[in-house]
């Protein structure tokens, strides 16, 4: 049995439970988005640079997805192809923008875009989509950003706890 793997499993398991408790108490933390960010923290290296990259690139992706909903709702540039055209434009901008060092992890930026789009599209009756353009904590992009930050921090904490447990 690998001692480090056991320690990480224990750490992530316990903190995962705490993460769910937090999500039930603070409704703007979306636990599944937090877990995506948590996993990306480790995929990006599991260190302070990964924490920074996970947060900045993930939120960048969330903002671009929010921009998709705002633009596609306000400006119809393609009739029945309006949505696909705006997806093409915003995803192009998303990937092109990963040349900027703080957004340079394209997979994390894409995940930020995807969780935002998924959250908005799959909300009951599309209830989140009209809220995209609001300046409030109820804006789905804000909730996703909060969740990315919290999930990334849980990733960092679980790594530190695992290291402390395994010695």
Residue ranges and their predicted role:
Residues 47-55, 77-78, 103:
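Interfacial helix-loop-helix linkers and transmembrane-helix boundary segments
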Residues 1-3, 13, 75-76:
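Charged, low-complexity, helix/coiled-coil-prone segments
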Residues 6, 10-18, 22, 51-67, ...:
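Hydrophobic, lipid-facing residues on alpha-helical transmembrane segments of integral membrane proteins
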Residues 28-45, 90-92, 99-132:
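Pore- and pathway-forming membrane helices of multi-pass small-molecule/ion transporters and channels
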Residues 4-5, 15-49:
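Long, hydrophobic N-terminal alpha-helical segment
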Residues 1-3, 163-167:
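Short, charged juxtamembrane terminal tails flanking transmembrane helices
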Residues 74-77, 124-138:
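Membrane-interface helix termini and inter-helical loops of multi-pass transporters
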């Amino acid at each position: 049995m690998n001692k480090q793997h056991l320690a990480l499993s224990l750490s992530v398991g316990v903190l995962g439970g705490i993460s769910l408790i937090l999500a039930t108490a603070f409704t703007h933390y979306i636990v599944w988005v937090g877990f995506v960010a948590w996993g990306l923290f480790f995929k990006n290296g599991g260190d302070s640079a990964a924490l920074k990259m996970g947060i900045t690139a993930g939120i960048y992706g969330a903002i671009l997805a929010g921009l998709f909903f705002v633009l596609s709702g306000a400006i119809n540039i393609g009739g029945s192809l309006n949505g696909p055209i705006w997806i093409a434009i915003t995803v192009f901008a998303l990937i092109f923008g990963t040349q900027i060092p703080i957004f340079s992890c394209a997979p994390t930026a894409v995940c930020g875009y995807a969780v935002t789009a998924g959250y908005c599209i799959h909300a009951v009756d599309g209830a989140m989509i009209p809220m995209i353009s609001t300046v409030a904590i109820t804006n789905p992009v804000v909730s996703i950003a909060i969740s990315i930050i919290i999930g990334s921090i849980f990733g960092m904490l679980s790594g530190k706890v695992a290291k402390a447990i395994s010695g």
